[in-house]
């Protein structure tokens, strides 16, 4: 991994729900990224000890009283970063690195996502996992998202639903309001490309937990499919 020089130009935002078993390792790894000034965890209505585990690992934690979905959690995290930048009287806002809560120790490998943004070569980077795991029922949702992005923009992403992304603050603001729930990644790609912003994929050695094929996993995929379809319906 090319870590790049240490700086404080990036704020890591981690939406999390019921991830008490993995969030501590994810936060610890993210705090070790050379460009990371702070890790913000947004506890999106967890019923377990996610918030306490994240806080004990060194994250700044903000919490939704009820589950509001990934898009809302990303907006809450970005607002927390804005307030921090304002409090520190920064001349320019920090870039935003969004990571999933279940990356665990592999979050330490997210540095390459920040490099094109820090260098001014990209407005948003999207991770492409070098090693993928088979996710139950995932193909349909990925196919829908990828086809929708291609139809809307002419670009075919390798991993359209990958949530590991680094954005400039200006790019994030250009995409607001974010799409609802699990449609946020699909909408981000379409909205930024349509506005002429630079989006690039970056291969990284990250990995997260497979969701399996059980009933709970299938319900999750159904929610994803619904949210992606809703995001596309308003953009095609």
Residue spans for each PLM region:
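Short, well-formed alpha-helical segments that are part of the catalytic scaffolds
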Residues: 18-32
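Conserved donor nucleotide-binding strand/loop of the catalytic core
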Residues: 51-90
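Hydrophobic helical membrane-anchoring modules
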Residues: 1-6, 177-236
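A conserved acidic beta->alpha catalytic loop
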Residues: 43-52, 103
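Acceptor/aglycone-binding surface of glycosyltransferases and processive sugar-polymer synthases
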Residues: 66-68, 72-80, 93, 106-178, ...
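Short beta-strand-to-loop acidic/aromatic patch adjacent to the donor-nucleotide binding site
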Residues: 87-104
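Short beta-strand/loop segment that forms part of the nucleotide-sugar
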Residues: 14, 27, 36-45, 62
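Cell-envelope/extracellular polymer assembly enzymes that use nucleotide-activated donors
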Residues: 9-11, 38, 187
């Amino acid at each position: 991994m090319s870590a790049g020089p240490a700086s404080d130009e990036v704020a890591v935002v981690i939406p999390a729900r019921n991830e008490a078993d993995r969030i501590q390792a994810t936060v610890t790894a993210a705090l070790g990224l050379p460009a990371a000034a702070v890790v913000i965890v947004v506890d999106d209505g967890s019923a377990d000890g996610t918030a306490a585990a994240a806080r004990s690992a060194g994250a700044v934690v903000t919490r939704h009283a009820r589950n509001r979905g990934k898009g809302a959690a990303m907006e809450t995290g970005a607002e927390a970063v804005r307030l921090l930048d304002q409090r520190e009287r920064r001349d320019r806002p920090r870039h935003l690195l969004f990571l999933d809560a279940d990356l665990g120790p592999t979050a330490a490998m997210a540095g390459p996502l920040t490099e094109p943004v820090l260098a001014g070569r990209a407005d948003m980077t999207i991770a492409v996992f070098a090693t993928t795991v088979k996710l139950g029922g995932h193909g349909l949702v990925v196919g829908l998202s990828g086809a929708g992005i291609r139809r809307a923009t002419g670009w075919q992403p390798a991993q359209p639903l990958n949530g590991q992304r680094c954005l400039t603050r200006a790019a994030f603001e250009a995409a607001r309001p974010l799409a609802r729930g699990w449609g946020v990644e699909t909408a981000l790609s379409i909205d930024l490309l349509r506005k002429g912003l630079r989006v690039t994929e970056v291969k990284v050695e990250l990995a997260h937990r497979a969701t399996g094929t059980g009933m709970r996993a299938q319900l999750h995929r159904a929610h994803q499919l619904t949210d992606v379809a809703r995001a596309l319906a308003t953009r095609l």
